[in-house]
């Protein structure tokens, strides 16, 4: 299949490899970006792409807390200009507060909630859309419950483009907020390595076994090296094993232990996570308009 310049650029942005290497990998992978990344990693030319690296949509995230319940939401807009204005921020807070109040099951149920007599949450979103002139959508949310002995910690980064919500047991709200800051900044995927699904580990092992630097090595040596790399991989994606963002001399596990607590769960939202933004070629668009 024909490989486009846009595909090559996207792969280079994600892996930092050269243009020809990116194109060769895409050709070999039949244009499949994820497969191309794996092929480059097998050749030792690229690191693992982070799960949340496809960020494209605009908008903001927010966290609302009410007693033993908290909600984290993502509200999308078409441009960052609208995402930063007063009307959008007012809507963002209203949506978060409504969701934490009623704990709806899903987005559809949330949009049907009555925020005031005769007006649903969806009506309110449509009203703000009419004011701003841009389509605004509630993309997703999570509602988290805690016990009386537990504490919430939340942190918003880069003017709400990233938010994190953490539940700790035994530790203070301040400690929970510090861990939420770490989650927002470092983007772990799991609390601990025992939560990593077997298929994720199996895929990583497959990639490592195919690494060119293992060619010709005895099987027992190869197995030991792969085992070490898997251990490192698990530490990189597991919150408790990561160096703590506020003190790199200790892990998150050591920090929370020093606070006489434990991490129960976390949720991290980054605006546009997993959404591919449509890129328009200006010259092509003008040509179309001119017929």
Curated annotation (Swiss-Prot):
UniProt source species: Leuconostoc mesenteroides subsp. mesenteroides (strain ATCC 8293 / DSM 20343 / BCRC 11652 / CCM 1803 / JCM 6124 / NCDO 523 / NBRC 100496 / NCIMB 8023 / NCTC 12954 / NRRL B-1118 / 37Y)
Cellular localization per UniProt: Cytoplasm
Cited SUPFAM superfamilies: Elongation factor Ts (EF-Ts), dimerisation domain, UBA-like
UniProt-listed HAMAP family: EF_Ts
One annotated Gene Ontology cellular component of this protein: cytoplasm
Gene that specifies this protein: tsf
Family assignment from sequence similarity: Belongs to the EF-Ts family.
InterPro entries recorded: EF-Ts_dimer_sf (IPR036402), Transl_elong_EFTs/EF1B (IPR001816), Transl_elong_EFTs/EF1B_dimer (IPR014039), Transl_elong_Ts_CS (IPR018101), UBA-like_sf (IPR009060)
Protein's name according to its UniProt entry: Elongation factor Ts
GO molecular-function terms, A-Z: translation elongation factor activity
Principal location: cytoplasm
């Amino acid at each position: 299949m024909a490989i486009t310049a846009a595909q090559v650029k996207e792969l280079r942005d994600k892996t930092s490899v050269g243009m020809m290497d990116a194109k060769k990998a895409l050709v070999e992978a039949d244009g499949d970006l994820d497969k191309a990344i794996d092929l480059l990693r097998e050749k030792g030319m690229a690191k693992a792409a982070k799960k949340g690296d496809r960020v494209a949509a605009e908008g903001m995230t927010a966290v609302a807390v009410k007693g033993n319940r908290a909600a984290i939401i993502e509200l999308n807009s078409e441009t960052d200009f609208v995402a930063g204005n007063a009307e959008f921020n007012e809507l963002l807070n209203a949506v978060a507060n409504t969701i934490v109040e009623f704990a709806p099951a899903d987005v559809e149920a949330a949009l049907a909630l009555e925020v005031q007599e005769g007006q649903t949450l969806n009506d309110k979103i449509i009203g703000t859309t009419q004011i701003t002139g841009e389509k605004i959508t509630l993309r997703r949310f999570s509602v988290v419950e805690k016990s009386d002995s537990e504490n919430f910690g939340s942190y918003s980064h880069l003017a709400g483009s990233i938010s994190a919500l953490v539940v700790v047991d035994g530790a203070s709200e301040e400690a929970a907020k510090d861990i939420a800051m770490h989650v927002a900044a470092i983007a772990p995927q799991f609390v601990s390595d025992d939560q990593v699904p077997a298929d994720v580990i199996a895929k990583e092992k497959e990639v490592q076994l195919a690494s060119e630097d293992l060619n010709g090595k005895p099987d027992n040596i190869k197995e030991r090296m792969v085992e070490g790399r898997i251990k490192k991989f698990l530490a990189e994606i597991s919150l408790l094993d990561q160096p703590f963002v506020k003190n790199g001399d200790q892990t998150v596990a050591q920090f929370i232990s020093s606070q006489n607590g434990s991490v129960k769960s976390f949720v991290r939202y980054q605006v546009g996570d997993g959404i591919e933004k449509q890129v328009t070629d200006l010259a092509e668009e003008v040509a179309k308009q001119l017929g």
